Amino acid sequence: AYSNGNRTKSWVNDGKLDSSSVGDFISMAKENFDKGYISGATQWTDDWLPQGMSDGAQANKTFGFFFPTWAIAKGGSLEQAEGGEGGSTYGKYALCEGPTSWFWGGTWICVYPKTDNAKEAGQFIYTMTANADAMQKYVDARGDFVNNKGVMDATTKAGTNSNPLFGGQDQFQILFNSADKIDMSIASEYDAKINTDLQNAVQDYCNGVTSSEDDCMNAFLDAVAADVTDITVE
């Protein structure tokens, strides 16, 4: 969220890594870690979701979660973090808009070039990515946020959505406002590798593998240089 929300420039400009925002993130992450603001559980592990409950061995160890939209629909990760329907924190969470809008992930649909069903495959892709009627039905059935601004605008204006995981709050209004502020101009083909290298370097610093901010920065730069060989890393 910090990487893709706080940066105003792409990771790579004119073939060179732009690490100007990294120092602030390293300092912030280490301070939060040292003050106990970070639970220490790794995202998507068995120890992570139970920290959202108010009972059990991992109870009350987190203030909140960063989730993708599919995780806050019925049957998603948030429901597990609440202990399921009737759980100790079921319906007690709320969704808020963060100080910056950010983006991550996505789903790729690929078609085998020698398929015998090219027409059907094309229809499927169109239906899933551009057919407003189909996307509206998906929103209504799944409670997920789709990549169609018109559909989501109509959904939020209807005001009929009520998410029991948030005690009846309409998550779509919050998500729509946040998504509308996303700046995709900073996206690059290198984001996944560079973000992962930054996370690994900062985790090592917080866990004592490296001992200073300079060491953390150098570890990050070395990792990017090894992983992304077609850019300049200085």
Regions from the PLM with identified roles:
Residues A1-V12, F103-V111, Q171-F172, K193-Q203:
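Periplasmic solute-binding protein
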Residues K9-S21, F67, E97, Y112:
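Short beta-strand->loop
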Residues W11-D46:
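Glycine-centered hinge/linker elements that transmit conformational signals in sensory
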Residues K30-Y37, P113-D116, Y126-A134, G143, ...:
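Sec-exported extracytoplasmic/periplasmic mature domains
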Residues D34, G167, Q173-E234:
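Conserved C-terminal helix/tail region of periplasmic/extracytoplasmic solute-binding proteins
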Residues D46-F65, N200, D204-V209:
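Short helices/loops that flank or line small-molecule/ion binding pockets
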Residues F66-G75:
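Beta->alpha turn/N-cap motifs
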